[in-house]
């Protein structure tokens, strides 16, 4: 029998925790405000990312904070990087904005590195600026650091369900900057044997078949993508494996979700499994709230100290 790994508990706890801290920050005159930037004009991505952005904004408002969503997908491609840089610089300067998310993926013609390099590291809710990213290679503290939201959310789920990572064979499918890459580094530090598979891997089946834990973070469901589609099904895994499904896309025409993991066939073999709805997505949003509170304190320290003028 499969045990479902649900994110609701983490999400509820994070909201309560964030609500308390919003009150404390208000005492020093700071209201957490999250700015989310959407740059992608691809219809699948726009539909998907709009959905995620509005859910995150709703969470922030529910705990007493504020949220703004900036959509830049109508700016002509040749000007989009420049406009995004101008927006990021203005968000960096504004004292009322305490956290920024540049929603991924950004379109291929946008200079993503330049955008993350321009973002103030203390407002970086995703821990994706060059310096924040590098810190992961040193060491991390799951409870106290601003860490990439989805990887940290997944580690919190493992902890909550008592799933051991030390010495386990873990396969991460996907090597994206948002999930696959940071998560594989974190798992390595937790003493797992980590294998990272991606579009150019020569073979995937034998690695997936022998894994104790499979984390699928691809986001190319066969219903939507013809080249390099990916879906994890029950035949591909061994009995008793732990499976975490991360990737998913909204079909812009039907509005329907399509996910990395075939829930039904995988549930027949897995010991633990995240549901496609109510699993990793909620754990991610829990972490967005926690990270926003932390960036808000970082900004509060800067803003408050800049108001103190000495003799
Ligand atoms: N810079 C950046 N930071 C991110 O954190 C980021 C990103 N880019 N790009 C896309 C992914 C994806 N992501 C999700 C957020 C919420 C749900 C979520 O709440 N899902 C609900 C269901 C959604 C629904 O009801 O439509 C659930 O799992 O139950 C899922 C996925 C954040 N991402």
Curated annotation (Swiss-Prot):
UniProt-annotated binding residues for NADP(+): 174-176
CDD domains: NAD_bind_m-THF_DH_Cyclohyd (cd01080)
Keywords: Amino-acid biosynthesis, Histidine biosynthesis, Hydrolase, Methionine biosynthesis, Multifunctional enzyme, NADP, One-carbon metabolism, Oxidoreductase, Purine biosynthesis
Pathways per UniProt: One-carbon metabolism; tetrahydrofolate interconversion
Record-level GO BP terms: L-histidine biosynthetic process; methionine biosynthetic process; purine nucleotide biosynthetic process; tetrahydrofolate interconversion
A Gene Ontology term for the protein's cellular component: cytosol
Coiled-coil regions, chain positions: none
Function statement: Catalyzes the oxidation of 5,10-methylenetetrahydrofolate to 5,10-methenyltetrahydrofolate and then the hydrolysis of 5,10-methenyltetrahydrofolate to 10-formyltetrahydrofolate.
Name the UniProt record assigns to this protein: Bifunctional protein FolD
Organism listed in the record: Pyrobaculum arsenaticum (strain DSM 13514 / JCM 11321 / PZ6)
Gene transcribed to yield this protein: folD
């Amino acid at each position: 029998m499969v045990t479902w790994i649900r994110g609701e508990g983490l999400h509820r706890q994070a909201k309560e925790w964030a609500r308390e801290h919003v009150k404390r920050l208000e005492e020093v005159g700071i209201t957490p405000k999250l700015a989310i930037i959407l740059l992608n004009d691809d219809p699948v991505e726009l539909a998907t990312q709009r959905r995620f952005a509005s859910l995150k904004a709703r969470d922030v408002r529910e705990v007493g904070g504020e949220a703004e969503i900036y959509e830049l997908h109508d700016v002509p491609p040749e000007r989009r990087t420049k406009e995004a840089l101008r927006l990021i610089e203005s968000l960096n300067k504004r004292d009322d904005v305490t956290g920024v998310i540049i929603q991924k993926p950004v379109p291929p013609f946008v200079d993503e590195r330049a955008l993350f390099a321009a973002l103030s590291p203390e407002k970086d809710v995703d821990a994706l600026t060059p310096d924040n990213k590098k810190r992961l290679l040193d060491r991390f503290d799951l409870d106290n650091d601003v860490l990439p939201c989805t990887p940290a959310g997944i580690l919190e789920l493992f902890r909550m369900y008592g799933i051991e990572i030390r010495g386990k064979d873990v396969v991460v499918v996907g090597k994206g900057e948002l999930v696959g890459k940071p998560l594989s580094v974190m798992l390595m530090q937790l003493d797992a044997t980590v294998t990272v598979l991606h579009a150019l891997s020569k073979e995937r089946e034998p690695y997936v078949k022998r894994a104790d834990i499979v984390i699928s973070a691809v986001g190319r469901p066969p219903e939507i993508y013809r080249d390099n589609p990916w879906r994890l099904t029950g035949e591909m895994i061994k009995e008793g494996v732990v499976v975490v499904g991360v990737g998913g896309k909204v079909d812009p025409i039907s509005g329907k979700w399509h996910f990395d993991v075939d829930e039904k066939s995988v549930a027949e073999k897995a010991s633990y499994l995240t549901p496609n709805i109510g699993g990793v997505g909620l754990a991610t949003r829990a972490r967005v709230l926690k990270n926003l509170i932390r960036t808000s304190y970082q900004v509060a320290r800067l803003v408050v100290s800049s108001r103190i003028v000495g003799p």
